[in-house]
Amino acid sequence: MFRTLLKSKIHRVKTTQCELHYEGSCAIDEDLLDAANIVENEQVHIWNIDNGERFVTYAIKGQRGSGMISVNGSAARRAAVGDLLIIASFAQVHETDVATHQPQLVFVDDANRQVELRHHVPTQQL
């Protein structure tokens, strides 16, 4: 049996562009793609912290070191410049590998530069 588990997350990135008439996708600074282990054309889930919108698209490379997060195509109607987003991808993990699976969790500063990398989500407390 396979389970769908969180593979990658880029947490609280700031939207830098919205390009309605671009071909689609989400352009992500290549440094962040590398840190999160997300490849070009990989499906990503995007959750907008500011307005609650959730949508699925695919990742494309944004200029390395630029901090770019550009929501493109029809998804551009789901975000505005300055909105905080969570970008996530998932993987099918075999049951025998679930216990050792470690996602890449990337945390950024206000300029969308990586400041921390974790491999687990802490247990939520009351």
Swiss-Prot record:
Q: What is its EC number?
A: 4.1.1.11
Which principal EC class is assigned to this enzyme? lyase
Name what cofactor the protein needs. pyruvate
Superkingdom, natural source: Bacteria
Record-listed substrate binding positions: T57, G73, S74, A75
CC per GO annotation = cytosol
Q: Does the keyword Lyase apply?
A: yes
**Where would you find this protein in the cell?**
Cytoplasm
- Can you cite a GO biological process for this protein? alanine biosynthetic process
- Name the keywords, alphabetized: Autocatalytic cleavage, Cytoplasm, Decarboxylase, Lyase, Pantothenate biosynthesis, Pyruvate, Schiff base, Zymogen
Residues annotated with Pyruvic acid (Ser) modification: S25
Which Pfam family, just one, is annotated for this protein? Asp_decarbox
Cite the record's note on assembly.
Heterooctamer of four alpha and four beta subunits.
PANTHER family per UniProt: ASPARTATE 1-DECARBOXYLASE
Q: What does this protein do?
A: Catalyzes the pyruvoyl-dependent decarboxylation of aspartate to produce beta-alanine.
What is this protein identified as? Aspartate 1-decarboxylase
Classification from the root reads:
Bacteria, Pseudomonadati, Pseudomonadota, Betaproteobacteria, Burkholderiales
